[in-house]
């Protein structure tokens, strides 16, 4: 076959395939159920890591009497996420729209992107499987992207992007031999566990409302 004819055939084939390639890479081709499944897997993993690491740290470093005084003191047990308007009970949660719950979940996830790095020494010494600051950070970033995608799908079919939420947790000494640092680490782990529980709960409610047959799982 002549070189010119072969080039023409290749060009024609490329033009025919172009619309298929564009459609195949388009956002709406991913089933909504799969998007929710992926988000829920990450949310559950983060919640489990947060719970296990918190429990492990508490048993290793925090005496019972110190735990009770910490939890009963509003100043030490106050989480930064308290500044993010979130429903405080089941009734309030059910009154929120899907987009409102996703937006709250996104803010909670973004509020931990930097603070989770302060817990580097805690994760490094943890025996909990998968508990490393890099792994937790990657899960947070993946879930952030997943929630933004879900928000875009529920709005107009386009991925939702936005600026990262700025948190105000202050940096502090994470030396494990410093009692003050121990309590601050304990406080961060307490808040991290609490916030990841909220995120998983809110995402499960939105999934139940949006995907048929997904309630109760």
From Swiss-Prot:
Keywords: Disease variant, Disulfide bond, Dwarfism, Hormone, Metal-binding, Pharmaceutical, Phosphoprotein, Secreted, Signal, Zinc. It is found in: Secreted. Changing residue 42 to C: In IGHD1B; reduced secretion. The keyword Metal-binding applies. The modification Deamidated asparagine is found at residue 178. Zn(2+) binds at residues 44, 200. Belongs to the somatotropin/prolactin family. This is Somatotropin. It comes from Homo sapiens (Human). The gene is GH1.
């Amino acid at each position: 076959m002549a070189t010119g004819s072969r080039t023409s055939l290749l060009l024609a084939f490329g033009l025919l395939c172009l619309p298929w390639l564009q459609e195949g890479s388009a956002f709406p081709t991913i089933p909504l159920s799969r998007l929710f499944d992926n988000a829920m897997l990450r949310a559950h993993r983060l919640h489990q890591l947060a719970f296990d690491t918190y429990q492990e740290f508490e048993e290793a470093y925090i005496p019972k009497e110190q735990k009770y005084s910490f939890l009963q003191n509003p100043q030490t047990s106050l989480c930064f996420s308290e500044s993010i308007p979130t429903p405080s009970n089941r009734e309030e949660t059910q009154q929120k729209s899907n987009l409102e719950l996703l937006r709250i979940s996104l803010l909670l996830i973004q509020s931990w992107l930097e603070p989770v790095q302060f817990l580097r020494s805690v994760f490094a010494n943890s025996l909990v499987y998968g508990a490393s600051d890099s792994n937790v950070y990657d899960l947070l970033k993946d879930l952030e992207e997943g929630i933004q995608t879900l928000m875009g799908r529920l709005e107009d079919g386009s991925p939702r992007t936005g600026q990262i939420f700025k948190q105000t947790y202050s940096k502090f000494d994470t030396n494990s031999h410093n009692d003050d640092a121990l309590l601050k680490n304990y406080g961060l782990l307490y808040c991290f566990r609490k916030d990841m529980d909220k995120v998983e709960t809110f995402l499960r409610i939105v999934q139940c409302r949006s995907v048929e047959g997904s309630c109760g799982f």
